């Protein structure tokens, strides 16, 4: 496998059992013989009907669903050998964006990002504030840092979710239907933002 690739899958079959890595038996086959190669600064769009396995593939890439068949690597982690104790280290190197945002509803925009940064090892408050300012400028929320999530539009909430995903400068972002709940104008804004992020060298795989 080419270690220069941020993601590489060869002959992968993916099973969904509804269980996490604690359960090692195979469940229902949802994808078979998948080959995927993603280099730096690439945007890859997974296309398929509802229930075709797109979300399960993304869950496999971030360690939620175990890979049991084929070869797979993401940001240097071997997915076949990924131990549960190593999943937090993997997720510090990737960004994850969900359709339903999963924001901290009791914290404002700034504190949503501050929480993630403290949880992933940032200690210097000056550096934290500087990085948050940079990221909010990137996603167009620089004048919303003290707004609560319920005060934001759907598109703004998704931009906050993207800010959270990029705050640790990941090599790749995995986005599960990030525009699924948005109106066309807001969805277009998100796609333009993704184009800007990709131009900066980060890869994005989205369904």
Can you describe what each PLM-predicted range is?
Residues 70-78:
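Conserved ABC transporter NBD signature motif
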């Amino acid at each position: 496998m080419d270690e220069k690739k941020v993601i590489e899958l060869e002959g992968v079959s993916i099973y969904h059992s509804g269980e996490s890595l604690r359960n090692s038996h195979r469940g229902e086959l949802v994808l078979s013989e998948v080959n995927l190669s993603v280099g730096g600064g690439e945007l890859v769009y997974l296309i398929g009907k509802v229930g075709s396995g797109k979300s399960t593939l993304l869950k496999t890439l971030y360690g939620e669903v175990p890979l049991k068949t084929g070869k797979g690597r993401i940001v240097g982690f071997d997915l076949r050998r990924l131990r549960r104790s190593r999943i937090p280290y993997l997720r510090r190197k990737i960004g994850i964006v969900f359709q339903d945002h999963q924001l901290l509803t009791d914290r404002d925009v700034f504190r949503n990002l501050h929480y993630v940064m403290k949880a992933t090892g940032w200690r210097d408050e000056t550096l934290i504030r500087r990085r948050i300012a940079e990221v909010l400028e990137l996603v167009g929320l620089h004048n919303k840092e003290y707004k609560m999530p319920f005060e934001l539009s759907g598109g703004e909430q998704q931009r906050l979710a993207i800010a959270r995903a990029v705050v640790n400068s990941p090599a790749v972002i995995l986005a599960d239907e990030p525009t699924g709940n948005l109106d066309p104008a807001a969805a277009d804004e998100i796609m333009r933002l993704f184009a800007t992020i990709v131009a900066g060298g980060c890869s994005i795989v989205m369904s």
